[in-house]
Regions:
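Alpha-helical transmembrane segments of integral membrane proteins
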Residues: 2-4, 13-16, 92-128, 144, ...
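Hydrophobic alpha-helical transmembrane segments of membrane transport/permease proteins
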Residues: 15-66, 159-181
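Membrane-interfacial helix-loop-helix junctions in multi-pass membrane proteins
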Residues: 53-62, 77-87, 168-185, 192, ...
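An internal, D/E-rich "acidic patch" concept
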Residues: 58-114
Length: 317
């Protein structure tokens, strides 16, 4: 097991290096002036050149990348052009809020998706199967930003049960474990959970249906094993894949939360990315993308290790 983990870590290192290169290239090759958020419209050419030198934008791309990679390896992602605050502090605060939102959304999606998937797979080719499958298809198909706006109109604007935006009372940018903060979390978390719910439901449904059609299940029933015992065998066979899908969905939610966080003004990485894009804040933009990409790579590594621990056949293969 330790040898397998060591190999997976070694495989991850070149992936991380490639992620940093792609992140740097995408940000720096995009059109636009990186100093548009700090320079006045009537700024002189001398002032522009001075700012370009200050932020190192006048250097060759390979030199900029080498300096940025060296500093990033030491925990320094530079300073935001728009706010002059360290990128690390900006991103760390936003990542914490996004982790809370994505984790809660993934747990909701996993719970509902597993329930719908098991029910649909166990009662396959029945009305219950068709209903659960229809719900999962709706979850995958509905645009979550549209669903978020619909939920805001119903539960915030019309009924007034839940707050429409923010992470806490008074526009607080920091989340806390109390009822007011939980109320702010409900709408974005439910909205974000719809896609993982649909994907997990379809995956679990296929796994359960496949397991029930295997010969060993018929043999267990012939031996008189109860349905509860058969259910335990089904869980054992579907758990590794279901957990892997859940981990991947958590990674996707971490990186794909920009629309949800913008709709609900949730102060996470998606909201931060949106602001950095419009302000053309290159240090903040590439720092945020890098942190999210590394989170996704490390999360996939953790999922691989967990899946191998649950199913040793993966390691042997």
């Amino acid at each position: 097991m330790l040898t397998y983990i060591f190999k997976r870590v070694l495989y991850t290192l070149p992936i991380m290096l490639g992620v940093t290169l792609v992140c740097f290239a995408l940000v720096h090759l995009a059109p636009g002036d990186p100093l548009v958020s700090v320079l006045p419209p009537d700024a002189s050419q001398a002032m522009k050149q001075q700012m370009m030198t200050l932020y190192g934008f006048d250097r060759p791309y390979y030199e900029q990348f080498a300096r940025w990679l060296w500093r990033a390896a030491h925990g320094d992602l530079g300073a935001s052009i728009a706010s002059s605050r360290p990128v690390v502090s900006e991103v760390s605060r936003a990542v914490g809020n996004t982790l809370i939102l994505a984790s809660v959304a993934t747990m909701i999606g996993f719970a509902l998706g597993t329930l719908f998937g098991f029910v649909a797979g166990y009662f396959r080719d029945t009305f219950i199967d068709k209903l659960a499958s229809f719900i999962s298809v709706i979850g995958v198909s509905v645009p979550h930003y549209w669903l978020g706006m619909v939920l805001v109109i119903i539960f915030a604007a019309t009924l007034g049960w839940l707050p429409p935006t923010g992470a806490g009372p008074g526009g607080s940018g920091k989340w806390g474990l109390d009822w007011e903060h939980v109320r702010h979390l409900i709408l974005p978390a439910v909205t974000m959970s719809v896609i993982p719910m649909g994907i997990i439901a379809r995956t679990v449904r296929a796994l359960v249906a496949e397991t029930l059609s295997q010969e060993f299940v018929a043999g267990l029933r012939a031996k008189g094993l109860s349905e509860r015992g058969i259910f335990r065998h089904i869980v054992k066979n579907t758990a590794p894949t279901a957990l892997a899908v859940m981990g991947i969905q958590l990674g996707y939610l971490l990186g794909g939360s920009i629309l949800i966080e913008t709709v609900f003004s949730w102060p996470g990485t998606g909201f931060l990315l949106n602001a950095a894009i419009f302000q053309r804040d290159l240090p903040l933009l590439q720092g945020t993308i890098l942190v999210l990409a590394l989170f996704f790579v490390l999360l996939n590594l953790a999922v691989d290790v967990l899946q191998t621990a649950l199913d040793p056949r993966i390691q042997r293969s």
